[in-house]
């Protein structure tokens, strides 16, 4: 038997859920296939969303009509603003979630999406389009076949997945779930080069066996925060957590009376005994014994790797994070490990707060297949097979947020492919999502890729606070958000621009009355005429103070005040980055034809020629960012493009 769809999404992790939602919202009849429908968007590792750069991605996903931000807000047990003392470019939200509640809310949300069908099935094979159907054929373990002109693979860690703890190894996509073996074979048969990557997860502890009096409290924010954009103009507010019943009584110091109920996290530190136990057992560590072949993420190393690499460090911080409102299971952030089970028990019990701890689940490593760099284009489509899209860990990334961002863009572009519309490609100056995808299509990924603020050249323009101003107008044009939401965002943009213009034009003079009013509200007096914007540019001055001192200033919403303050305090830096973007866009707008012949370019180095032919950059800007390409190579390509254009004009 067979059934036909417009778009088929294989895998329902964070990438697959966003991909299926976007494709269905854009009018495509969409099928989401997953091994277990009860584990949609399952948090296999850390029960958290956000962090530096990752939080920016989630804000952008929400601004584009995606799901991750709002479901995080509804399932969060704690939310915090990181890097609060630093500038707005690197400030980022991070939330602890109830992992089972998150998965349930995602499933309930997707079940209500028109045009979207959910099916529980193991995908065994994928066959390319043939002349008769012009569709991919996706075959499940029962033999049922599904046909579609566009398929999105979001396979996570399931491609030939292998779990490892000590000397024990077993096939698994994650603990308790079978790997996808045949799918790897099909991808290899289609010509896709596969690489082996590795990730890991820490033990989970029984909260009742932890001495929380020996831990350091990590409370949630006292100030309302959210990943989703909520507009009071539309009657929206930050939603409360959707849990049923009181929190598990094992967690001390719950924050139940603030702006929303929250649970704290708790910090402990490793000990000299902890380090000694690991060193004595390195010969049993799969990471060092040769059992593990895959390359792991450099920026999220296992605890045994930390002890070896940072041998001079006396202790490492570990965070005990509740996995939900009503569960006693506690995640040990910072303790990823694949050491043997007895070693895990011994090392954790060497920490004073964990002397009597019981492990509910042991830590393990997962090895899995990913597709080598250079196989996808900027629309998430594969170079070898048009209509086939990849998103998430199959592209060599790590992290829920990176996966969700790719899934969203793959879903949009798969829908556009089916509908004959042009692809949607975000630039590096438009979004962190654009930086992420550009890196995946222009850089050699030798280890699991993680997003950082340092990867974004224009991070002061790509802040979390302005994600909707940057991206919601596009989402409205695409059909991912409604007109009411877009209108509110546009009104805020206009209010911000008008307020900034007023403040740059409004001058105040150093009279006795003005200075007395400024000082009365905690603002240093002025000695010469200045604009309101110049006063607000002072780091310590807030708009509310200034308006109290100068009552004729306009009343503004909190959202507009935030934009106005950033616009004044960072105006010079913002203007500089905008000039850099303008220069860069000249290169980005210079398209390189897909069939451009690099073999005939005189003067182009052999290394550059090989790189260019492998990655086939779409623009001159992309070409310049490829590893192994220097400015001289770019100049040769530019000269050839101009000559080709001149020849076409002459003809």
From Swiss-Prot:
Source organism, top-level taxon: Bacteria
Cofactor(s), names only, from the UniProt record: FAD
UniProt keyword annotations, A-Z: Cytoplasm, FAD, Flavoprotein, NAD, tRNA processing
Subcellular location: Cytoplasm
UniProt GO BP: tRNA methylation; tRNA wobble uridine modification
UniProt-listed SUPFAM superfamilies: FAD/NAD(P)-binding domain
A GO CC term assigned to this protein in UniProt: cytosol
Positions that bind NAD(+): 296-310
One of the record's GO molecular function terms: flavin adenine dinucleotide binding
Pfam assignment, any one: GIDA
Listed PROSITE patterns: GIDA_1, GIDA_2
Binding site for FAD: 11-16
Self-association state and partner proteins as the record states: Homodimer. Heterotetramer of two MnmE and two MnmG subunits.
HAMAP family: MnmG_GidA
Family to which the UniProt record says this protein belongs: Belongs to the MnmG family.
Function noted in UniProt: NAD-binding protein involved in the addition of a carboxymethylaminomethyl (cmnm) group at the wobble position (U34) of certain tRNAs, forming tRNA-cmnm(5)s(2)U34.
Protein name: tRNA uridine 5-carboxymethylaminomethyl modification enzyme MnmG
Organism of provenance: Chloroflexus aurantiacus (strain ATCC 29366 / DSM 635 / J-10-fl)
Gene of this entry: mnmG
């Amino acid at each position: 038997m067979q059934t036909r769809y417009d778009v088929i999404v294989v895998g329902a992790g964070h990438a697959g859920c966003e991909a299926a939602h976007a494709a269905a919202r854009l009018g495509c009849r969409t099928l989401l296939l997953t091994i277990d429908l009860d584990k949609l968007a399952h948090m296999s590792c850390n029960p958290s969303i956000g962090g530096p750069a990752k939080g920016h991605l989630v804000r952008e996903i929400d601004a584009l009509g995606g799901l991750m931000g709002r479901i995080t807000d509804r399932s969060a047990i704690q939310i915090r603003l990181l890097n609060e003392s630093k500038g707005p470019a690197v400030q980022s939200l991070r939330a602890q979630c109830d992992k089972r509640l998150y998965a349930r809310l995602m499933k309930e949300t997707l079940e209500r999406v028109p045009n979207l069908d959910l099916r529980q099935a193991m995908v065994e094979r994928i066959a390319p389009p043939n002349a008769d159907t012009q569709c991919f054929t996706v075959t499940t373990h029962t033999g049922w076949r599904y046909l579609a002109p566009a398929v999105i693979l979001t396979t996570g860690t399931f491609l030939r997945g292998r779990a490892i703890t000590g000397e024990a190894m077993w096939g698994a996509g994650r603990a308790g779930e079978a790997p996808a073996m045949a799918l790897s074979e099909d991808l290899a048969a289609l010509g896709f080069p596969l690489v082996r990557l590795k990730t890991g997860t820490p033990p989970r502890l029984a909260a009742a066996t932890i001495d929380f009096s020996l831990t350091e409290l990590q409370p949630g924010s006292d100030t309302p925060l959210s990943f989703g954009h909520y507009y009071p103009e539309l009657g929206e507010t930050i939603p409360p957590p959707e849990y049923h019943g009181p929190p598990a009584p094992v967690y001390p110091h719950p924050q139940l009376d603030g702006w929303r109920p929250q649970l704290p996290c708790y910090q402990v530190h490793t000990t000299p005994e902890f380090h000694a136990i690991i060193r004595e057992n390195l010969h049993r560590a799969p990471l060092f014994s040769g059992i593990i072949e895959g390359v792991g993420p450099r920026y999220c190393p296992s605890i045994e790797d930390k002890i070896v690499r940072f041998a001079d460090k006396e202790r490492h911080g570990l965070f005990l994070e509740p996995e939900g409102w009503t569960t006693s299971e506690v995640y040990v952030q910072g303790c990823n490990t694949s050491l043997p089970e007895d070693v895990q028990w011994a090392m954790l019990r060497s920490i004073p707060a964990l002397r009597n701890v019981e492990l509910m689940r042991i830590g393990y490593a997962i090895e899995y297949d990913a597709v080598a760099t250079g196989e996808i284009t900027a629309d998430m489509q594969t170079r070898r097979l048009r209509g086939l899209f990849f998103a998430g860990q199959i592209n060599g990334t790590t992290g829920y947020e990176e996966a969700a961002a790719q899934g969203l863009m793959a879903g949009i572009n798969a829908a556009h492919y089916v509908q004959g519309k042009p692809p949607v490609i975000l630039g590096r100056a438009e979004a962190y999502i654009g930086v992420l995808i550009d890196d995946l299509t222009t850089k050699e990924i030798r280890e699991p890729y993680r997003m950082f603020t340092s990867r974004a050249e224009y991070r002061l323009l790509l802040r979390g606070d302005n994600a909707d101003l940057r991206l919601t107008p596009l989402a409205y044009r695409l059909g991912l958000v409604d007109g009411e939401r877009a209108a509110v965002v546009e009104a805020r943009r206009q209010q911000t621009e008008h307020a900034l213009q007023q403040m740059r034009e409004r001058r105040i003079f150093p009279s006795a009355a003005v200075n007395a009013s400024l000082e009365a509200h905690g603002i240093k007096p002025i000695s010469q005429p200045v604009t309101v914007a110049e006063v607000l540019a002072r780091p310590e001055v807030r708009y509310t103070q200034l308006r109290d001192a100068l009552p004729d200033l306009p009343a503004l919403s909190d959202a507009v005040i935030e934009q106005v303050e950033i616009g004044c305090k960072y105006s010079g830096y913002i203007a500089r980055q905008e000039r850099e973007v303008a220069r860069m866009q000249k290169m980005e707008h210079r398209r390189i034809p897909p069939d451009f012949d690099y073999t005939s370019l005189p003067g182009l180095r052999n290394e550059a020629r090989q790189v260019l032919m492998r990655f086939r950059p779409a623009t001159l800007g992309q070409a310049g960012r490829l590893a192994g390409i220097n400015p001289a190579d770019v100049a040769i390509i530019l000269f050839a493009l101009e000559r080709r254009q001149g020849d076409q004009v002459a003809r």
